[in-house]
Design a protein with these regions (language model features):
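Structural/interface elements that position substrates and couple domains in central-metabolism enzymes
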Residues: 1-427
Length: 427
């Protein structure tokens, strides 16, 4: 393994922590087509906040010819000497919730241009079972002119990064590995085992590893959909859902999930990958898609609950001032991709309310680019007819929310983290 040189393709929330970890033992080239991202990383700063600046700076190198460490580049020339290529690009869905494999195709083309005999290409992106061998490998073969499992090989090791989580970092999460042949499976497993302290699980085939990843997220999506449905039912009965879940949770085998908005680039997306693949085989999934529909309905449900509470408090809805706390997809993380807080905001605006969005974690330029919404990173002055806590950022727990409300204002807690006696409604 001494001659090993790794290229990590895609330096986002998944790729950068992995590249940094590999760089503690191996020479690593981090490759990304975004030149701004490369400049930022080479200066020793990570805007995703997944890798602390000091930790990043500890492995950074100034050129591609180093012994161990990380060099970030957008130049194809810098990755041509690598013999392991790890692809960590996003796998989103389009506006019709169909899998969009464009980033995978493009990154496979990139690797195909520098692929040599004996190289191993490992995919980490979440896909449906069969995508690596049926969609990605043909691109590698076509561009490189090499033959799969003769000249070059493949592996699949699904990412399990939890953005914003400083406890379960990449090396502390057990890694599923796989290879295109039994021998390659062992090599891929050994590579990850050398840096992942939590250990590895070698799956028998690439398809098994792909399927394992996509059901991890689908299972979580379905479990959250169940408690979201319970929240709707118990709210009609005037029963506190969180109190019910707390009581039920005293049984040893009750699974603890909380109601909420399900967004981000994994849980709200991956079930569609599995569903489409199932449909290609002639099976129409019922529970998977029902869970997606229910979770996707929660933003408009929250908005309508807030409007109902405002009407009951004799608040005029048109031009009412509403403060939304948080637009990222989860707490203590700057990632705004596929955030469902946007559904709440858009629904509120459809009632002609004036919505102010405060999020100290979100990059305002990114929010404008993604959703055409104005946000602020500093707490705005003034008082509001309604405040909705949509994201549990630690900063929000320190706010005196009562002082931001008008005398008859409404406080709604989507996350269930505020004192229930202080709020007018919660999921």
């Amino acid at each position: 393994m001494n001659t090993l040189k790794i290229a990590v393709i895609g330096l986002g929330y998944v790729g950068l922590p992995l590249a940094r970890l590999f760089a503690t033992k191996y020479p690593v080239i981090g490759f990304d087509i975004n030149q701004g991202r490369i400049a930022e990383l080479q200066s020793g700063t990570d805007s995703t906040l997944e890798v602390e600046d000091a930790v990043l700076q500890g492995v950074l190198r100034t050129n591609a010819q180093m012994e161990t460490g990380l060099f970030c580049s957008h130049n194809l020339e810098d990755i041509k000497d690598c013999n392991y290529y790890v692809i960590t690009v996003p796998t989103p869905v389009d506006k019709n919730n169909r899998p969009d494999l464009t980033p995978l195709y493009k990154s496979s083309e990139t690797v195909g241009k520098v692929l040599k005999k004996g190289d191993i290409v490992i995919y980490e992106s979440t896909v449906y079972p069969g995508a690596t061998e049926e969609e990605c490998i043909p691109v590698l073969e076509k561009v490189s002119g090499l033959k799969f499992n003769v000249d070059f090989f493949a592996g699949y090791s699904p990412e399990r990064i939890n953005p914003g989580d400083k406890e379960h970092t990449v090396e502390k999460i057990l890694k599923v590995t796989s290879g295109s042949t039994p021998e390659i499976g062992q090599k891929v497993d050994a590579l990850y085992k050398s840096v992942i302290t939590a250990g590895t699980h070698l799956a028998p085939t690439i398809k098994v590893a792909e399927a394992a990843k996509v059901i991890e997220n689908s299972q979580r999506d379905i479990n959250i959909a169940f408690v979201n449905e319970l929240a709707k039912i118990f709210n009609l009965m005037d029963i506190d859902t969180h109190a019910v879940l707390e009581a039920a949770g005293t049984k040893w085998n009750f699974l603890p999930f909380k109601p909420g908005l399900v967004g981000g680039h994994c849980i709200g997306v991956d079930p569609y990958y599995l569903a489409q693949r199932a449909q290609e085989f002639g099976y129409h999934p019922e529970i998977i898609l029902a869970g997606r529909r229910l979770n996707d309905s929660m933003g408009s449900y929250v908005a309508s609950e807030v409007i109902k509470l405002m009407l009951q408090a004799d608040i005029k809805i048109k031009n009412a001032n509403v403060l939304v706390l948080g637009i990222t997809f989860k707490e203590n993380c700057p990632d705004v991709r596929n955030t469902r807080a946007v559904d709440v905001i858009q629904q509120l605006e459809s009632y002609s309310t004036q919505v102010t969005i405060y999020d100290p974690w979100a990059n305002p330029a990114e929010v404008v680019h993604e959703y055409n919404l104005e946000t602020t990173t500093t707490l705005p002055q003034g008082t509001y007819d309604a405040i909705i806590l949509t994201v549990a950022h630690k900063e929000f727990l320190e706010l005196d929310l009562k002082s931001l409300l008008k005398p008859n204002g409404i406080l709604y807690d989507v996350k269930g983290i505020l004192d229930p006696k202080e709020v007018h409604g919660r999921l």
